[in-house]
Amino acid sequence: MENNKKNNQKQNSIDETEFPNSKVLLVSVKRTRRFLERTARELLAGGTRYIILSGLGDALPLCVQLQASLQSKNAATVVKIETSYSYFNTNYSYTPGLKIYMEKHPEFKGSRISPGYVSFCEKPDKFTPIFDETPNEYICSVNAGDNNLHVGGEGINAAFSELLSAHGHEVDKYESLFKELLSKAVKENSEKADDEVKSVLYESVEKKYPDVKLALCRVRNSLKKGSDNTTGSVFIVTFKKKFPHKKEKNMGMVYVVGPKGKNFNSVEDFLDAVHETAENLMTALCDYNGLVKREEIKHVRMNTCRICLFSGHAFKHSNASKLDVAKSILNGLAVGYRHGPSPRLNFAYDENVFKDAWIETTGLQVFNHNEKEQ
């Protein structure tokens, strides 16, 4: 057994030298091919160049099936195959082994986000509703906010104000809530790199803000302008009782402060800021669900987040298209995506740009909201 361990260590060293930037995917019959393929695609989309499919014994057929599936879909190509026949003291027998070395296909696009986690709203008569009247799962909806941190004004921010006011919310209080929470987030994270920033909670928020059950904020230090930390910041609030359409599953609002195009000299810098904001959004969503899973807060899991085209209208850079903004949002979300805590992502209709961006950047299938695969 000790010899097998030494041989494995030696082989791993050889693999790292011959195939830099590689990941070993252990193939087991305890996992479905669908799960293994999704994992392989996520690794490739995340920057891995080589996938090494490794299986023993009864996993060999599954290993070959996985290789064939990845190759047929232009995800990866075979560069090397190794077979082995090793003796294991644990069962006093020889076991066949297989390693299939695959390199990312040059035409591979893909996404770290599982296709089953993404859906798109169909074209509405006017606008995609902020919340459905009969939701079948717990959902939060993104509000494209601004640097003043108020709820109201124009576009979807005005629609949020109207909807929440109609259900009894004191919408004017959200601005002071967000400013207090932002101040706390900045104080606790001002010297940290973005990947070290922690989401902060407003303790006992319902005492001062009775419409709110929970309030969370995550800042994006790289987008700070002078003393202004608002750009790129994300706020999650869950409602205490006054739910939109009187449905408890319409659980909360996600207030996102996207970048303003007029504040950027180049369209590239603007789109980079959109990308960073979307990454921060996804991280905040995962942080919330992570707190729920670890029972650090007694709240329900957010099953779905409906996402609008923030920074894609009045705030859009004059040289950027809506499709450019949608691509940056999708790519940013993919960077922050974590399969376990991430909610499903439902994209509001906006000239079909989210669906077009998904197909163009990933080449993957699409789903309509509350519809079967098309």
From Swiss-Prot:
SUPFAM superfamilies, per the entry: AlbA-like
UniProt KW keywords: Cytoplasm, DNA-binding, RNA-binding
Reported phenotype of the disruption mutant: In sexual stage gametocytes, genetic disruption causes a significant increase in the number of activated male gametes with no differences in total gametocytemia, sex ratio and mature-immature gametocyte ratio. Typical coordinated arrival of the sporozoites to the salivary gland from the midgut is affected. No significant differences in the prevalence of mosquito infection, oocyst numbers and total number of sporozoites per infected mosquito. No significant growth defects in asexual blood stages.
Signal peptide as annotated in the record: none
Gene Ontology molecular functions: DNA binding; RNA binding
UniProt cross-references to InterPro entries, sorted A to Z: Alba-like_dom_sf (IPR036882)
Places the protein is found: Cytoplasm; Cytoplasm, Cell cortex; Cytoplasm, Perinuclear region
CDD domains: MAF1-ALBA4_C
Chloroplast listed as a keyword: no
Ion transport found in the keyword field: no
GO annotations of cellular component type: cell cortex; perinuclear region of cytoplasm
Highest taxon above the source species: Eukaryota
Similarity field: Belongs to the histone-like Alba family.
Protein purpose: Possesses DNA- and RNA-binding activities. Binds to DNA with relaxed sequence specificity. May associate with the subtelomeric TARE6 repeats. Regulates the abundance of transcript sub-populations in a stage-specific manner. Regulates activation of male gametocytes. Participates in the coordination of sporozoite development in the oocyst.
This protein's name: DNA/RNA-binding protein ALBA4
Gene: ALBA4
